[in-house]
Amino acid sequence: MKIGIIGAMEPEVAHLVESMEKPSSTTIAGIEFVAGQLAGKEVIVTRSGIGKVTASIATTLLIEKYAPDAIINTGSAGGFADDLAIGDIVISSEVRHHDVDVTAFGYEIGQMAQQPAAFIPDAKLVAAAQKAVASLGEVKAIEGLICTGDSFICDPVRTKTMLENFPTMAACEMEGAAIAQVCHQFDVPFVVIRSLSDNANNDSPVDFDEYIVKAGHHSALMVIALLEQL
């Protein structure tokens, strides 16, 4: 089984690359793809860059060049669930865009025209992630809605609006829905796994800088544990 793994930033993929056996690196359009073995599986780890456009480019290149059987998106996120702390993990139950609005044409808020309102992760990948939670010790993990947009969220007014639009949102980030949409187009199974680096509030810029390495490491450990379940 060949698995593609996508993270936006170096701290989000560093532990994965360091843990790989026989890594081989290729760069296409400024995006690095590292192929090798991880947890007994053939993997391609990709550092996409930040945001929905670069994530879409990276996902398309990954699928076209390497033909993975499934894709895992890993990394950090801002937390919206009251019972989660920095470092805890959200496994996607569904993924949506929070910054898309074509409701004038009868679509749901967050739904791009001619696309589903929500992108649903692969049930087998989610089940493997659930089993992997037990190996993480004291790190808490839940399933929940993950929303994506091209903004770093730290404004309480914007947070309030987002929760009005998506009241069950557990986390927000900047790549997941774009990756999920590309996977949907190519019919490739996916799951998004994110560790919280901040709580999407006024302290988020400080928290993010302080905790991004911790969040990236926790998310990477979760990915490795998931691979061991496949």
Swiss-Prot record:
Disulfide bonds: none annotated. It comes from the Bacteria. SUPFAM superfamilies: Purine and uridine phosphorylases. InterPro entries: MTA_SAH_Nsdase, Nucleoside_phosphorylase_d, Nucleoside_phosphorylase_sf. It catalyses: S-adenosyl-L-homocysteine + H2O = S-(5-deoxy-D-ribos-5-yl)-L-homocysteine + adenine; S-methyl-5'-thioadenosine + H2O = 5-(methylsulfanyl)-D-ribose + adenine; 5'-deoxyadenosine + H2O = 5-deoxy-D-ribose + adenine. Its EC number is 3.2.2.9. The active site is at E12 (proton acceptor), D198 (proton donor). This is 5'-methylthioadenosine/S-adenosylhomocysteine nucleosidase. It comes from Shewanella pealeana (strain ATCC 700345 / ANG-SQ1). The lineage of its organism: Bacteria, Pseudomonadati, Pseudomonadota, Gammaproteobacteria, Alteromonadales.
